[in-house]
């Protein structure tokens, strides 16, 4: 038995204190796991309760660092679970509480867009294998940096996270024949990246031309210790064979049944072990999309009562100004992550700034994050064993 994961639905009259006492946890842990800043909770809101249930009695030579390494814990998790530990030295006869990961190892690919907050970046690094900076573009005049990432690259490397550069294509003629492969590789190496991410759809190019381009690009990258991540779009799945990894994009607004069916269908016809499944970051506000965190926080501030649609996996409420707002529930994300595990995907991909901390905490309670540029395929294939 590992961590007890409970998804609690808030009832009328419940407060953080009441809920914390009910599950034998603290208000501080509830706030941290659910990104709660004020006192307001929405009736019908789902809260994540994580309670470590295993203990380990340290040996004489054990330190906090060695125990963290042994059980795959980050500092925040270790010290949060064990308030009696103040530094690297472990008190005598203290039982260390830890969290096993029932789904085993997986990789994560977090996207860093312009405007991502430093605090959010620092918090998310604990859970990342790769960080993809959406920071460069192919233009008619060459490669252009959209924003500076030099400091963030250093921070990522210190945390053992591989930095990757996402290169947009903003040329007037998007044929792959006119791409200078050496310039792409030189740009990645000069800036300190460990890999390159490209959209696999190139307007005006035949699939055979794109495949030939990817073969030549990958050959140049391997000689420079770089990896290639392909971002799929319509009709480009077969091109993933030419990449080290690829991203199966989210269809924002799809219900849980549609998500599960799409992921299963992909796994049955493609190589899931080298594929990241993108996680949702948007809900719906009327006919428009709205970030899930904003949808949830609006409900808290306005003290709206949330309705749960178990068939779709969405929570919803009627906002006074914008009408119906709906967004994926914690149950949706838990089930989506179970699907990722069941069909043997490499891991998940998500927008660092937009992916709710609640969702990330569910992921981290289920998977151990790989921290290496060289994927440990044996660890992935034996996931959960």
Feature-to-residue mapping (PLM):
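Short, acidic/polar
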Residues: 112-127, 175-190, 233-239, 328-341
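Primarily a LysM-type cell-wall glycan-binding module
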Residues: 1-23, 45-72
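Active-site-adjacent "subsite" loops/lids of carbohydrate-active enzymes
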Residues: 170-191, 247, 310-320, 324
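Active-site groove signature of glycoside hydrolases
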Residues: 132-135, 181-209, 234-237, 245-250, ...
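Glycan-binding loop/region signatures in secreted carbohydrate-active enzymes
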Residues: 273-276, 281-336, 364-384
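Glycan-recognition patch characteristic of GH18 chitinases/ENGases
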Residues: 98-183, 375-376, 380
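Substrate-binding surface in catalytic domains of secreted glycosidases
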Residues: 140-147, 203-303
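Hydrophobic faces of well-ordered beta-strands that scaffold small-molecule active sites
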Residues: 108-112, 131-133, 163-167, 196-198, ...
